[in-house]
Curated annotation (Swiss-Prot):
Signal sequence, renumbered to the chain: none
UniProt short sequence motif 'KMSKS' region, positions renumbered to this chain: 228-232
Pfam name, any one: tRNA-synt_1b
PROSITE patterns associated with the record: AA_TRNA_LIGASE_I (PS00178), S4 (PS50889)
GO terms of molecular function: ATP binding; RNA binding; tyrosine-tRNA ligase activity
Catalytic activity: tRNA(Tyr) + L-tyrosine + ATP = L-tyrosyl-tRNA(Tyr) + AMP + diphosphate + H(+)
Protein name per Swiss-Prot or TrEMBL: Tyrosine--tRNA ligase
Quaternary assembly: Homodimer.
S4 RNA-binding domain span: 340-404
Biological processes per GO annotation: tyrosyl-tRNA aminoacylation
Binding of ATP, residues: 231
C-alpha cells in the first residue's frame, strides 16, 4: 500500500519534519488525526492558504482525518512570524465575522461529512483559560532562552516585541496539546514560516502528555525567483469570488511564468504526476496549453466547474476574436520592443495619445493586460504576456486593442 508521504514528497509539499522516520511509520501503520491552523485576520482565505488545504486534502484522501483549526483565540494576540511590526489588533466582532466566513469557504475544499474532518476554533479553550493555571501547567515547559532564538522572535527583537506577542508560541503549542487530548491528534501540518511554533507544540505534547507528536511543514508557494506567489501588486489573490473574480483568478494562473507551471500543477491540482511532468516539459508555444490546463484545474477546485468553464470561455473569446472581440483594433510591434515599459509601447503604437494619459489611466485602475489590472506605471511588456501570439489591452470598460509581433 502506497504511503501518502511518498506522494506528498513527490509533489513537493514537504519542507521539514520534526521526526521523519516516526512520521513515515505512523502514516503507514495508522489512520491518524492531524491539524492545520488558519489565522482569521481576513474574511476570506487566499492562495497561500489553498496550498495548505491541498496538503490536507491529499492526507484526507489517504484516509487520515483533518482538523481545520481556526485561530479565533490566537487572533486576539497576533502571530509575530514573518512580521517586522506588531499587527493591528482586531475586535472580537471582526474576528467572529472572519471565522464565520472562513468556515463556509473551507467546507468547499474539505469533506466534513460523517466526521471525516473536524472544524475547531481555539477560542473555545483559549478565551476561558485561567492565566495562573496556564503559566503553571504550560509555561513551565517553555524556556525563554530557547524561545528568544526562534526565527519568529529574533527579527522582532531590535524593533520591539510585545509581551502579548511573546505569548503566541505558548498559545499555539497549547492548541496542539488540547487537540491531542480531545481528538487524539498526533500531527501538525503548517507553512514553513510556522516552524518554531510547531516545534513548541510537538515538545509540549511529548512532555506534558507523554504522547506521540510530530510536525511537518509544507513548502511556501513561491515562483522561480523565490517570490511569494498568489500576490498581485493590488494585494492577495483571494478565494472569495467577491474579492477576486473567477475570471481574474483564472487569468492569474494563465499568466504564470513557464518555469512555474510544473510546480503549480503538482501543488495545486490533483492531476497524476505523470501528466504533471508531461505538461511541465512542454516548451515554446506549447507551454500555453499547459497554462490553460493549470488555470482551468485550479479555478475548478476553488470556484467550481461552471465558473471555471465560464472563465475559460471568456478568455478564449477575448483572444480568439469572439462575438464581442471580432473587430478589435490590432497593432504590431517588433520583437525588440518586448521588454520595454507598456506605456512606451502603447504610446508608440497610438493605443494611447500620450504616456501622461496612460499614467492617468493606470492610476485610476482603468488599464488591464490579458484581463489583469495593471497596478504600476513601470509595468514591463514581457514575452509571457503574449498568449497565442497576442496581448489583449483593455482601456476603461469597453475599449480593447491587440498587440501582435511582426
Amino acid at each position: 500500500m502506497a504511503n501518502v508521504l511518498d506522494e506528498l514528497l513527490e509533489r513537493g509539499y514537504i519542507k521539514q519534519f520534526t521526526h521523519e522516520e516516526e512520521t513515515r511509520k505512523l502514516l503507514e501503520n495508522e489512520k491518524i488525526t492531524f491539524y492545520i491552523g488558519f489565522d482569521p485576520t481576513a474574511d476570506s482565505l487566499h492562495v497561500g492558504h489553498f496550498i495548505a488545504m491541498m496538503f490536507m486534502a491529499h492526507m484526507q484522501r489517504a484516509g487520515h482525518r483533518p482538523i481545520a483549526l481556526i485561530g479565533g483565540g490566537t487572533a486576539m494576540v497576533g502571530d509575530p512570524s514573518g512580521k517586522t511590526d506588531m499587527r493591528k489588533m482586531l475586535t472580537k466582532e471582526d474576528i467572529q465575522h472572519n471565522v464565520d466566513s472562513i468556515k463556509k469557504q473551507m467546507e468547499r475544499f474539505i469533506d466534513f461529512s460523517d466526521g471525516k474532518a473536524i472544524l475547531a476554533n481555539n477560542a473555545d479553550w483559549l478565551l476561558n483559560l485561567n492565566y495562573v493555571d496556564f503559566l503553571r501547567e504550560v509555561g513551565v515547559h517553555f524556556s525563554v532562552n530557547r524561545m528568544l532564538t526562534a526565527e519568529c522572535f529574533k527579527q522582532r527583537l531590535e524593533k520591539g516585541l510585545s509581551f502579548l506577542e511573546f505569548n503566541y508560541m505558548l498559545m499555539q503549542g497549547y492548541d496542539f496539546y488540547e487537540l491531542n487530548q480531545k481528538y487524539n491528534c498526533k500531527m501538525q501540518l503548517g507553512g514553513d514560516d510556522q516552524w518554531s511554533n510547531m516545534i513548541a507544540g510537538v515538545e509540549l505534547v511529548r512532555r506534558k502528555a507523554q504522547g506521540e507528536a510530530m510536525a511537518m511543514t509544507c513548502t511556501l508557494l513561491t515562483n522561480s525567483q523565490g517570490q511569494k506567489m498568489g500576490k498581485t501588486v493590488g494585494g492577495a489573490l483571494w478565494l472569495d469570488p467577491a474579492k477576486t473574480s473567477p475570471y481574474d483568478f483564472y487569468q492569474y494562473w494563465r499568466n504564470v511564468d513557464d518555469a512555474d507551471v510544473e510546480k503549480c500543477l503538482a501543488l495545486l491540482t490533483f492531476l497524476p504526476m505523470d501528466e504533471v511532468r508531461r505538461l511541465g516539459a512542454l516548451e515554446g508555444a506549447e507551454i500555453n496549453g499547459a497554462k490553460k490546463v493549470l488555470a482551468y484545474e485550479i479555478t475548478k477546485l476553488v470556484h467550481g466547474e461552471e465558473e471555471a468553464k465560464k472563465a475559460e470561455e471568456a478568455a478564449t473569446a477575448l483572444f480568439a476574436g469572439g462575438a464581442d472581440m471580432s473587430n478589435v483594433p490590432t497593432v504590431t510591434i517588433a520583437k525588440e520592443e518586448i521588454g520595454l515599459p507598456i506605456l512606451d509601447v502603447m504610446a508608440s503604437t497610438k493605443i494611447i495619445p500620450s504616456k501622461k494619459e496612460g499614467r492617468r489611466l493606470i492610476e485610476q485602475g482603468g488599464l488591464s493586460i490579458n484581463g489583469v489590472k495593471v497596478e504600476g506605471v513601470n509595468r514591463i511588456l514581457t514575452e509571457e504576456d503574449f498568449q497565442d501570439g497576442a496581448v489583449l489591452i483593455k482601456r476603461g470598460k469597453k475599449n480593447y486593442n491587440k498587440i501582435e509581433i511582426k
